[in-house]
Amino acid sequence: MRSSIHASRLRKMGQSIPASTGPMARSANRFLQNRAAIFGLVLLTPLLFAVLTYPLWLPYKPNDIDLMAMNSAPSWKHWFGTDGVGRDVFARTMEGGRISLLVAVSSVVLSTAIGFLIGAISALGGRWADAIAMRSVDLAMTLPPVIFLLVLASIIGSGIWSTVVVIALLSWPVLSRMIRARLLELREREFVMASRGMGAGLGHLLFRHGLPNSIDILVVYATLQVANAILLEAGLSFLGLGVPPPAASWSNMLNAARSTAVLEQFPWQWLFPGGALVLAVLAINFIGDGLRDAFDPRAELN
């Protein structure tokens, strides 16, 4: 009664009644107030636009060879200069961004799927499923990551999709533990217990209850893991186990320019792809930190 009287008084005074907002709207508002996250978006958006659209407006292809312009410095004709066989460094930097981001995003999608399924099955599948899943996670986390990465890469081989598989197999255990912790709390709630009592199967529990209640973890993990995957691909390609030439990626462009002569005499061959890699990783980390703060449940208490 008092609330209706108060609302009618507000209407008479011409004041609007504040509408309640949902958790997603509040998270979006917190993200938009994060200056570092917005700065990351400002950095990443033009880079993504250039990487995705460069074939439409750039006259050079990544593997076009011009023997008359080998090791040319940056100019109006070749904005980032050329490499040792006359290939346009700007075109290769844009193509390298495509391949590096393709490897990173694909590996993150695969590792996110593996991590969610194992963590959710561990939490919702019963005692034996929990024991088996967690022992596999413990085994994966005890392996030295660098040695594990090199052994997997040498077994599977080099190539774009081989690199995707290698990075994904290294990245899923942390996510599975996070998902398990979230869903162990969820499975004791009334609506999940009611679903179990009505005979709901594991698939229903995973995708009807587990997935919607893990979206915040998945979004934050995937965003931050993209930056980590770019760096892992860079390490593999720098060691000759990632994306093989002549395909361009930021990391194998750096690998091709690591000789002393190139480092000292032709710095544009490593400066531009290295700068693009650093900017992309920095921007994605800023965005990931912003998403993590936006989805932080402790922010609801402030």
UniProtKB/Swiss-Prot annotation:
InterPro entries: BP-dependent_transpt_permease (IPR050366), MetI-like (IPR000515), MetI-like_sf (IPR035906), OppC_N (IPR025966). GO terms for biological process: peptide transport; protein transport; transmembrane transport. One of its GO terms (cellular component) is plasma membrane. Residues 97-288 form the ABC transmembrane type-1 domain. Residues 1-22 are annotated as: Disordered. The chain crosses the membrane at residues 38-58, 101-121, 147-167, 230-250, 268-288. Pfam families: BPD_transp_1, OppC_N. Coiled coil: none annotated. It comes from the Bacteria. It is a multi-pass membrane protein. Keywords: Cell inner membrane, Cell membrane, Membrane, Peptide transport, Protein transport, Transmembrane, Transmembrane helix, Transport. The complex is composed of two ATP-binding proteins (BAB2_0817 and BAB2_0818), two transmembrane proteins (BAB2_0815) and a solute-binding protein (BAB2_0812). Probably part of an ABC transporter complex that could be involved in peptide import. Probably responsible for the translocation of the substrate across the membrane. Belongs to the binding-protein-dependent transport system permease family. PANTHER family: D,D-DIPEPTIDE TRANSPORT SYSTEM PERMEASE PROTEIN DDPC-RELATED (PTHR43386:SF1), OLIGOPEPTIDE TRANSPORT SYSTEM PERMEASE PROTEIN APPC (PTHR43386). This is Putative peptide permease protein BAB2_0815. It comes from Brucella abortus (strain 2308). The lineage of its organism: Bacteria, Pseudomonadati, Pseudomonadota, Alphaproteobacteria, Hyphomicrobiales.
